[in-house]
């Protein structure tokens, strides 16, 4: 079961070793981004991979994902997505005692010490958070710095982020495009509001911005 934010990378990274080791595979891509998997299925067919070696099932996670996890003829589940989804997969897989491998949501720490190349590291860390329109679980979104250099770090981060081009993803200069869906956009807005309510300092951006 693969997520929407890296719809080719995640599929290939799971499928390639599976096929190479002689195992059959059943893929359920994210219902938000299924088209890449359809292309991969066509490629597998054109490559004359025997019928039944690669199987593609589209559908909603709580329906198809649960059926796959609980199915006694599936020996292992490989899941990449949210922690909530991972818990559901683990529970549904328990009765058949199948192996479960999971890569779930993260809040990656980025530790920058006083003797580091401070400006370069702050700037690079802030910019990495914008990759894939900020929709990556491995983005270093939790930056830990010496408290004595907080104001300096804020200024460097602000200067970096305010140079990021938001726009049409088809334009070469664009760094941040639209989020994957309206519901994801609203979730981000809600998280910004929650952060401010809990005492976070808004360095740049804010409500109404991705």
Model-derived segments and their meaning:
Residues 70, 76, 84-210:
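ALDH superfamily catalytic-core signature
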């Amino acid at each position: 079961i693969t997520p929407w934010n890296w719809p080719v990378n995640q599929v290939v990274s799971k499928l390639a070793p599976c096929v190479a080791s002689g195992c059959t595979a059943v893929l359920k891509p994210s219902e938000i981004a299924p088209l890449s998997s359809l292309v991969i299925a066509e490629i597998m067919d054109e490559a004359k991979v025997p019928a039944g070696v690669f199987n593609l099932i589209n559908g909603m996670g709580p329906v198809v994902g649960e059926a796959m996890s609980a199915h006694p003829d599936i020996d292992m589940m490989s899941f990449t997505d949210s922690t909530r989804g991972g818990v559901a997969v683990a529970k549904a897989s328990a009765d058949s005692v199948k192996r479960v491998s999971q890569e779930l949501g993260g809040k990656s720490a980025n530790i920058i010490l006083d003797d580091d190349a401070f400006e370069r590291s702050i700037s690079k860390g802030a910019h990495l958070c914008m990759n894939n329109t900020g929709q990556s679980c491995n983005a270093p979104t939790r930056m830990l710095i010496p408290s004595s250099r907080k104001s300096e770090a804020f200024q460097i981060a602000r200067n970096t982020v305010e140079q990021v081009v938001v726009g049409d993803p088809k334009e070469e200069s664009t760094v941040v495009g639209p989020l994957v869906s309206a519901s994801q956009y609203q979730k981000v807005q809600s998280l910004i509001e929650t952060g401010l309510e809990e005492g976070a300092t808004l360095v740049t951006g804010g409500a109404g911005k991705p």
